[in-house]
Amino acid sequence: MDSLFIIISLVIVILTTIFILSNLLSKKTILLPGKTGLPLIGESIDYFNKLRTGINEKFVMERKLKYASDVFKTSILGENMAFLTGPEGNKFLFSNENKLVQVWWPSSVDSIIKKSHNKSAQAESAKVRVLLPPFLRAHAIKHYVSTMDSELRQHVADFWVGRDEVEVCPLVRKYTFALAVRLFLSVRDPGELEALARPFEEAAGGIIAIPINFPGTRFNRGIKASQRIRKVIGGIIEQRRKDLSEGKATPSQDLLSHMIVEVDRRNAENPDIAPATDSDISSDILGLLIGGYDTINTTIVFVMMTLVEYPDVYDQVLKEQREIAASKAPGELLNWDDLGKMKYSWNVACEVLRLRPPTVGAFRVAKTDFNYGGYTIPKGWKLHYIPHFTQKNPDYFPNPEKFDPSRFAGDGPAPYTFVPFGGGPRMCPGNEYARAEILVFMHNIILRYNWEKLIPNEKVVIDPLPRPSQGLPIRLIPHKA
């Protein structure tokens, strides 16, 4: 009996030990290196401090070195969050979109871009993206180039010609917003344009604000501004439906017509699903306008700032643009083939995008538990990548603070190291649109002007995207005929 008791006891001890060890090993794979910091606050203070000083890549590098790991945990915006670093991490996130991870946005996005059926903006984003290819892919952008050029020529005539000095930031915002509204909504009426433009910046600012909805806060102002914009767009949709029914508008004339027709078709084909409404279309249009607004504005502004700081680069861009202009008849508008010849100009823009990424990066959420780097990322955890980490990393871009457009000549950077537009299925659907608009702007301004900064040492502030603190006032120096 005693020996049986001893055997049973040993078996229990062995099984218990195995259970404890296996549990510990399991936890070891779940518990990522890193810390989540204070409750609710987490490590948000350090993250945003580095973001505002333009060194948010150091937030990643410090922890990567501290934990000797390519993956670590933290807590930002009150969320448990994993960082997958380097090109390998970028590739993993991009290639597993809609498999292991899916898009996630902070709650501020849902508050600004509100849907009628209370579904989150990220839950709807995939549906919206299905509607975009006919209008934002390369084959469609080909037809926009001449319109972009025509609109910009008129903008320059209205706001640049005859002026000795201009402030770049507000002029770039005015042009890019007016162009987007023209192409997406066919809006040209100055009254409608002003009704959309006036509250737009507050709505865009609310997206990236701390989500505290008290009167007077940036977030609260953003919500109210978005409501005003959606009301204006709602009126445009109502009139467009009438025009479509009377044959005064066509389903293919712009993004709005296409979305109306496509949404109506899907509602009819899926009667058991809550139908999308005109309010949803309005929110989707608002989201698209906001989505591309800062990317293009930031890049154009810093191209302008950079070219004045590097005269040799300016001279090479001017030479390239003059060669293109010389190949065209007087008054002839730019076309898609012309943009393909602007190789050095685009290398310059890419180097600006590398040094001044016009985004803080992107967020994902784990759809299921998955393994990465020997650790398990739990379902529901958020993931974050920032382009700054690879784009300003000397391992991938030697002497990373040096402005050097030649980095993008030939084969260019290694895969997944230059990611200003994301990658994989979530590649920014407007990247070709942004490329075209940036190059058309460079062509028109550089052919007409050189310039000098009125504030030579104007600081760059980041809130949370980079911008010249005083709006980049410049003195225009027209080229001699």
Swiss-Prot record:
| Superkingdom as given in the UniProt entry | Eukaryota
| The entry's keywords | Heme, Iron, Membrane, Metal-binding, Monooxygenase, Oxidoreductase, Transmembrane, Transmembrane helix
Name the InterPro entries on file: Cyt_P450 (IPR001128), Cyt_P450_CS (IPR017972), Cyt_P450_E_grp-I (IPR002401), Cyt_P450_sf (IPR036396)
What is the E.C. number? 1.14.14.63
Tissue-by-tissue expression: Highly expressed in roots. Expressed at very low levels in leaves and petals.
Residues bound to heme are 428
Q: Name one GO molecular function term.
A: oxidoreductase activity, acting on paired donors, with incorporation or reduction of molecular oxygen
Biological process (GO) annotations held by this record are:
biosynthetic process; sterol metabolic process
GO CC terms, sorted: membrane
Location(s) in or outside the cell: Membrane
The secretion signal range is: none
Cofactor needs:
heme
Please give the function described in this protein's UniProt entry.
Answer: Involved in triterpenoid saponin biosynthesis in roots. Is also able to oxidize oleanolat to cochalate.
Question: Which protein family is named in the record?
Answer: Belongs to the cytochrome P450 family.
Q: What is this protein called?
A: Beta-amyrin 16-beta-monooxygenase
Species of the source: Platycodon grandiflorus
